[in-house]
Every structure is written in C-alpha cells, then in structure tokens.
Amino acid sequence: MARRAQRKAERAKVKQWYKVLAPEMFGRTPVGETLANDPNKLLGRVIETTLGDLTNNFSKQNTKLRFKIDAVAGDTAYTKFIGHEMTTDYIRSLVKRRTSRIDAVVDVTTSDGYLVRVKPSCFTVKRARANQVKAIREISRQVIISRAGNIDLNGLIQEVVLGKLSLDIYKDAKAVYPLRRVEIRKTEILAGPGEVPHPAAVPEPTVTAGS
C-alpha cells in the first residue's frame, strides 16, 4: 500500500520542462527540452541529436550524437558525450559493387583516462586482396591508437566528428590500395577515468566486398 501511495503521489507532482544542453566540447549548445516531475529522474536519460542540428550544417545530418544527462541545476539539464554513429543509410551508400569495405574495432585510452571504442570503415576503389585488407585494417588500428594516446577525450571526439582522424587513416592507408573514403562510423565511451568497463566481447573485424 505504501509503495502504491508513493507512486500515486509522484504522478500527482506537476511535471516541468527542462532545457537540455550539449556537453562542453560542443559549446553547451541547447539540444532540446525534456519533461519530468522530479529532476533526479532526468539523471541517466539519453538524448540523441545530429551534428547537423547542433551546428546548423545540413551536410552533417548523417552523424548521430548520443549524450547522457549527468547533472541538473534549476531548469537546466547538463549532459556528457557517450558516443556517436553514422547513419545506416549513409554507410550503405558508400558500399559499391566490386569494392571492399574494411571494418575494424579499436579500443583506446585517451590521455585523460577515458576508454573509448572506435570503429573505422575504409572503402576501396576496387575489390582489395586479402593481404591488402589486412594491411589497411592494421594501419587503421595504428593511426587510431597512436593519436588517441596523445590527446584527451575532447580532442579525440573533435577529430572524429570533424573528419581529421579518418583523413589521417586515409592518407596512410591509400599507399596500400586506392581508397574512395574512410569514415569513423561509430564511437562508444566504455569507461571514464578510474572506472571499470562492463565486460563486452569485441566483434571480429570484417571485410565486406560488393558483389
């Protein structure tokens, strides 16, 4: 009875709109509003937007950003970055007949102690041989590991969403086999400084050849 009465009392509370701000690395830009009858219920809520909406640049609509509310002050909810992902339609549009798509999964630790999973994809001009696929995948890994260890989370995410990291991979890997494009298709924050990440199996990197 007490629990039922508590739920009834919570439902009776007046709901309030809270302004949601992007993380500091994205300039605390407003990303929308969310409704709650208790500010504590906002903590942990995940907010999705696109880089296009955040920057008013329509060409960036294929980049989805995920933020998590981690603090509330007054009628404002603050967020932290937890990952990004390119839209499925966009990635599919890059796969052409008789070409290769070379995926990799790279777990890296930034200079400020964040464990980040980075998933690059390289798209070749024509179908690559197995040894070329292996070499390009290894170059992707080494570029990401080398860069991530020398910059903080903010710097890494900026290089991902602005395309600098994918450009660095492209410059090094094109010497192995001509590439049409390189994208960092997804990132995930696995753990913050001092946190223990949840156990997760790392999928095998794959190559997909257009038929």
Curated annotation (Swiss-Prot):
Coiled coil: none annotated. GO terms for cellular component: ribonucleoprotein complex; ribosome. InterPro entries: Ribosomal_eS1, Ribosomal_eS1_arc, Ribosomal_eS1_CS. It holds the Pfam family Ribosomal_S3Ae. One of its GO terms (molecular function) is structural constituent of ribosome. Keywords: Ribonucleoprotein, Ribosomal protein. One of its GO terms (biological process) is translation. PROSITE patterns: RIBOSOMAL_S3AE (PS01191). Belongs to the eukaryotic ribosomal protein eS1 family. This is Small ribosomal subunit protein eS1.
